[in-house]
Amino acid sequence: MRSALSAFNEVWQRQFRADCLSQIQALPEQSRFLIGCSGGMDSMLLLHLMSFLCPEKIRVIYIDHQLQACSHAWGEFVRAQCAALNLPFIIQKVQVAQGNLENQARSARYQAFAQHLQADEILVLAHHQQDQAETLMLRLLSGAGVHGLAAMKKFDVREDFTLWRPLLDLSREQICQWAAQLHVQNIQDLTNFDTDYDRAWSREILWPLLSDRFPKMQQALSRTSYLMQDADEILYEVLQQDLAACGSSQMLSLAALQQLSQARQRQLLSHWMKGEGQYRPSFEMVQRLFSEVIGSREDSQAALHWNGFYYLRFQQQLHRIAKAEYLPTEPIQEVAVVTCVAGQCHKLPAGHFVIQPSEVGLSPELLGQQLQIRPRLGGEKIHLYGRVGSWPLKKAIQQAQIFPWQRHTIQILSRDNVMLGVFTPQGFWLAQSEFCTQAGWQPTLSLNAKSAISDLQS
């Protein structure tokens, strides 16, 4: 390791070093670090400081957004700097989707980070105090609540990875001073000064005006973000209690929800819609959920789409349904032929079904025979085993309270036009027929099908 003492001369620099080492030592011993480096001053300083503190534990990644002609050259600059420091280096090109350029570039960048992060590896980024203050101010102007105003956390544990921002308490002036002291080379991205972008406009035009009037604004806004993080943590604890009382991540009881105050209802719905995502819905989107779905008639089947999920009311429940489940892309084959074998697992639209022995079920003579499976056509009747008489299959489905968005997955198993049973999302319904017998077999719905799957739709 190079001598680090000369890099940490001033009191605040020594304090930074002590804080970083303390945070590193608090992590599991096997923890390693992937540094996101753009080649700019902030990330190049971070690169040098981390190379002083734990060179044997770091890798470096440069994301080439391919938005500027010189982006490849910047990547080669970072590669050369890493080679001089003997640090492993990755360059990853990404395609930025159409839309808001800042948001889409950020999304592509984080997807690339997640792709390269290894087990026990923490992503390290160079956001600093002014970045934090700018983020809070921009979110305030966009109408964010407590969660949004909490801005960036120093340690951010996400679903897929953990993110560490060691420079978050350093001012822009401190970073410039330290980079000059260490003779850190860096590139200059001119888009950082392009006021067509909100953040650059804020930094170049709005920030100087406010700073002249409020010299301590940067520190004050940074402090506010920490206070908002405290408030957000307390709010999260309350929301977890409310969620447990009202339902789950996929369903809320409207009766239980309506026992809460309006403020807690609104916060719970916002938290619930966010799910495992990073961002909450807008205030207007939550209000639409109230007016268009919760306030709709029970039989209206109103649905609200946001961020890949559909939000629907079914009777006195509110459901969060993935788009793939609500709007299936693969049509169900009209008629398929299936051969059932004991222990075999079959993949159907209604779920995975395993052929298992049953005290009462279908005759073993049907095993290995060709059976037919088809979707509902409408008007079918079923004589459920153990019940008296036949009744409309539609009524049986309604009585079982199978969700409307799942009913298209229901299929009928038959032999020579004799109904043997019905595959439903709740399980297999055995039909009374000449093929029913003691010591038979039935398809059993499996919640964790690990057996070999026979796709009946192929």
Label the predicted regions.
Residues 101, 217-220, 300-302:
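Residue-level recognition of alpha-helical structural elements
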Residues 88, 166, 208, 215, ...:
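Proline-centered helix-kink/hinge sites
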Residues 2, 8, 12-39, 59, ...:
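AMP-forming adenylation/ATP pyrophosphatase catalytic core
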Residues 2-208:
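Core alpha/beta nucleotide-donor-binding catalytic domains of modification enzymes
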Residues 178, 202-210, 264-275:
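PAPS/PAP-binding and catalytic site of the sulfotransferase fold
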Residues 205, 209-221:
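Conserved anion/nucleotide-ligand pocket segment
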